[in-house]
UniProtKB/Swiss-Prot annotation:
Keyword terms, alphabetized: Carbohydrate metabolism, Cellulose degradation, Glycoprotein, Glycosidase, Hydrolase, Polysaccharide degradation, Signal
Role according to the record: The biological conversion of cellulose to glucose generally requires three types of hydrolytic enzymes: (1) Endoglucanases which cut internal beta-1,4-glucosidic bonds; (2) Exocellobiohydrolases that cut the disaccharide cellobiose from the non-reducing end of the cellulose polymer chain; (3) Beta-1,4-glucosidases which hydrolyze the cellobiose and other short cello-oligosaccharides to glucose.
Family of the protein in this entry: Belongs to the glycosyl hydrolase 7 (cellulase C) family.
Native source species: Cochliobolus carbonum (Maize leaf spot fungus)
Protein name (database record): Exoglucanase 1
A GO MF term: cellulose 1,4-beta-cellobiosidase activity
Gene Ontology biological process terms in this record: cellulose catabolic process
Region described as Disordered: 407-434
Residues bearing glycans: N44, N47
Signal peptide positions on this chain: 1-18
Recorded catalytic activity of this chain's protein: Hydrolysis of (1->4)-beta-D-glucosidic linkages in cellulose and cellotetraose, releasing cellobiose from the non-reducing ends of the chains
Pfam families hit by this protein: Glyco_hydro_7
Length: 456
């Protein structure tokens, strides 16, 4: 996946991350019920009362005690942010109007994320949310020898969008107390992922002002010198055309800063960095089964479906990541690979080795420890993220089209979906599909076989 400068937000005040706490708007997390399960068959599940919080990147950042922007469009205030330390002390982030400004709503066990939300004075694009355990702490998950299940409706997600559900090794408290971070998880701080994103405006309690370059493609985004790297488990990256699940191991524990092209894996240094940016992905279309997922396919994306992901292993060891689906009461095993030289319908070390060879891809997955390193990270605990985003880097073509765009679509691994190579430009999607929405619901978590009736 290529989550580079992908998250855009435009509000009346100009979105930004800051580490002090403002007082203009109260922060009230939307409630979300989910379940933990025991036994087998999905019949013994108990409700858990949780909530979601909006990532701090989308929030209004202003001077402490005032109403002047610390970040406007895609540039920092020279008055309040002449350097990283000053900016962090001078600027505060505020509470969020979840539905009115950001298009985020919950109802019992369902979370709905709307792509474009237009208010009286503002427009917001996309969102990223985290599941909370308490008002000040993210819910942590250890996925080893467990399964994670949810329902999803992608029927309103066209080419170029990604309704994503994934896990990253963030701090449970959002890094509160690091540097000048006084906001913490309550305000959605501490993000990192395997793309070592440079668009994170505050990292470890310090503003990412040094070397900040406003994006030419994204009117709200930019890139600072520092990247925020950490292991990532993509359970679900999808629209109505294509879907993939992908482990991304990294070196180190939790959020690791990178500050040069090599360690960040930027540009031509993609395979030199501390994280596996490509990951080992399972996309049924890319694996040669073109009628398994999509509108009217075996898994019909015009209708809601249940997604089950199992993490086979013990302790900190991970041996296999399996996938099942349920739709219209029928259980479907994941599609088998139809690529010559690659067998299986799950992610294992042997599958990843064979797939990289068949596709001619560089395997930073193996170089960075593969499933062993991914398992160690998962055992340390991950935060659940649910988001909706458009891709300012490569228009989501890596997920739903032919990529690279100049590749022969008949070459193994090049075709990932049926979207045209000209599709997915964020400005086009924002204009043509402003009502695009993803709904995640009915989250269940427990031992293998506890969340659904698993076939023999």
């Amino acid at each position: 996946m290529y989550r580079t400068l992908a998250f855009a937000s435009l509000s009346l005040y100009g979105a930004a991350r800051a580490q002090q706490v403002g007082t203009s708007t109260a922060e009230n997390h939307p409630k979300l019920t989910w379940q933990t399960c025991t036994g087998t068959g999905g019949t013994n599940c108990s409700n858990k009362s949780g909530s979601v919080v909006l990532d701090s990147n989308w929030r209004w950042a202003h001077n402490v005690g005032g109403y002047t922007n610390c970040y406007t469009g895609n540039s920092w205030s020279t008055q309040y942010c002449p350097d990283g330390d000053s900016c962090t002390k001078n600027c505060a982030i505020d509470g969020a109007d979840y539905s009115g400004t950001y298009g985020i709503t919950t109802s019992n066990n369902a979370l709905s994320l709307k792509f474009v939300t237009k208010g009286s004075f503002s427009s917001n694009i996309g969102s990223r949310t985290y599941l909370m355990e308490t008002d000040t702490k993210y819910q942590m998950f250890n996925l080893i020898n467990k399964e994670f299940t949810f329902d999803v409706d992608v029927s309103k997600l066209p080419c170029g969008l990604n309704g994503a559900l994934y896990f990253v090794e963030m701090a449970a408290d959002g890094g509160i107390g690091k540097g000048n971070n006084k906001a913490g998880a309550k305000y959605g701080t501490g993000y990192c992922d395997s793309q070592c994103p440079h668009d994170i405006k505050f990292i470890n309690g310090k503003a990412n002002v040094e070397g900040w370059n406003p994006s030419d493609a994204d009117p709200n985004g930019g890139a600072g010198k520092i990247g925020a790297c950490c292991p990532e488990m993509d359970i679900w990256e999808a629209n109505s055309i294509s879907t993939a699940y992908t482990p991304h191991p990294c070196r180190g524990v939790g959020l690791q800063e990178c500050s040069d092209a090599a360690s960040c894996g930027d540009g031509s240094n993609r395979y030199d960095g501390q994280c596996d940016k490509d990951g080992c992905d399972f996309n049924s279309y890319r694996m040669g089964v073109k009628d398994f997922y999509g509108p009217g396919a075996t898994l019909d994306t015009t209708k809601k479906m249940t997604v089950i992901t199992q993490f086979l292993g013990s302790g900190s060891s991970l041996s296999e990541i399996k996938r099942f689906y349920v739709q219209n009461g029928k259980v479907y095993k994941n599609s088998q690979s139809a690529v010559a030289g690659v067998t299986g319908n799950s992610i294992t070390e042997s599958f990843c080795t064979a797939q990289k060879k068949a596709f001619g891809d560089t395997s930073s997955f193996a170089a960075l420890g593969g499933l062993n390193e991914m398992g160690a990270s998962l055992a340390r605990g991950h935060v659940l993220i649910m988001s909706l985003w458009g891709d300012h880097a490569v228009n989501m073509l890596w997920l739903d089209s032919t990529y690279p765009t100049d590749a022969d679509p008949s070459k193994p691994g090049a075709a990932r979906g049926t979207c045209p190579t000209t599709s997915g430009k964020p400005e086009d999607v924002e204009k043509n599909s402003p009502d695009a929405t993803v709904v995640f619901s009915n989250i269940k978590f427990g031992p293998i076989g506890s969340t659904f009736a698993q076939p023999a």
